[in-house]
């Protein structure tokens, strides 16, 4: 392994990032680019776990707004994350990266069930592991899944790969010209200031387990690799003080 800052990472890839500018569904070209970015990090010997969102296909809160029972709508969202995971797995394996998908809801014909010890073993053997299906429970986001899985597999960091967002700002930079980008924050800052990085459950879980986060722009070439190697890009969130 080369000298990287992080040895085992959880990469959170939002569904929106896989949709690209089309805004819905899976953009094949975007998935190819993301897969190649992941391969460049895998080639460094870094152990990579990925959590896929599903917002490019379905969101539980959308279903609830339509009058659906929230739990039912959330389960649909979990299925969406599996579709994204399978697309990413296919692209990674096509470029020579051994990849396993583990789902929190069993569907053995297409993926392994989530087993923590097996996931860690895959990582130790140099395989990428994609966690799909969220936590397997309604009312929990895929951000919370990322925090939970990072704690379970003892990851060094959670990389929050955003779609055309290069860090955390004091306000929306697209609408507020006075918005200031933060280079560093604490988990408590995120919670107390209500900054839109991840939901409060995920933030609290990350803080309680002392897991740092790096929020960065997925759309800039080599950014995942740069973060892993310790480059000062995006916003780093860690600690309580």
Curated annotation (Swiss-Prot):
It catalyses: UMP + ATP = UDP + ADP. GO terms for cellular component: cytoplasm. GO terms for biological process: 'de novo' CTP biosynthetic process; UDP biosynthetic process. Allosterically activated by GTP. Inhibited by UTP. It is found in: Cytoplasm. Its EC number is 2.7.4.22. ATP binds at residues 12-15, 55, 59, 163, 169, 172. It comes from the Bacteria. One of its GO terms (molecular function) is UMP kinase activity. Residues 20-25 are annotated as: Involved in allosteric activation by GTP. UMP binds at residues 54, 74, 135-142. SUPFAM superfamilies: Carbamate kinase-like (SSF53633). Pathway: Pyrimidine metabolism; CTP biosynthesis via de novo pathway; UDP from UMP (UMPK route): step 1/1. PANTHER family: URIDYLATE KINASE (PTHR42833), URIDYLATE KINASE PUMPKIN, CHLOROPLASTIC (PTHR42833:SF4). Catalyzes the reversible phosphorylation of UMP to UDP. Belongs to the UMP kinase family. Homohexamer. This is Uridylate kinase. It comes from Latilactobacillus sakei subsp. sakei (strain 23K) (Lactobacillus sakei subsp. sakei). The gene is pyrH.
């Amino acid at each position: 392994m080369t000298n990287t800052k992080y040895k085992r990472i959880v990469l959170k890839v939002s569904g929106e990032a896989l949709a690209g500018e089309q805004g819905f569904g899976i953009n094949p070209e975007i998935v190819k680019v993301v897969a190649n970015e992941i391969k460049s990090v895998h080639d460094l010997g870094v152990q990579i776990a990925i959590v896929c969102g599903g917002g490019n296909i379905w969101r539980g809160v959308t279903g609830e707004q339509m009058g659906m029972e929230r739990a039912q709508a959330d389960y649909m969202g979990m299925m969406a994350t599996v579709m994204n995971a399978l697309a990413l797995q296919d692209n990674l394996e096509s470029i020579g990266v051994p990849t396993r998908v583990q789902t929190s809801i069993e569907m053995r014909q297409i993926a392994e069930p989530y087993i923590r010890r097996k996931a860690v073993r895959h990582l130790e053997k140099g395989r990428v592991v994609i966690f799909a299906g969220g936590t397997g429970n309604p009312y929990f986001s895929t951000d919370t899944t990322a925090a939970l899985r990072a704690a379970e597999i003892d990851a060094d960091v959670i990389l929050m790969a955003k779609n055309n967002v290069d860090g955390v700002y004091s306000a929306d930079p697209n609408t507020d010209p006075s918005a200031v980008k933060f280079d560093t924050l604490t988990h408590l800052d995120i919670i107390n200031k209500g900054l839109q990085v991840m939901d409060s459950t995920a933030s609290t879980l990350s803080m309680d387990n002392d897991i740092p986060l790096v929020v960065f722009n997925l759309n800039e070439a080599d950014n995942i690799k740069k973060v892993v190697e310790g480059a000062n890009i995006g916003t780093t969130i860690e600690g309580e003080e």
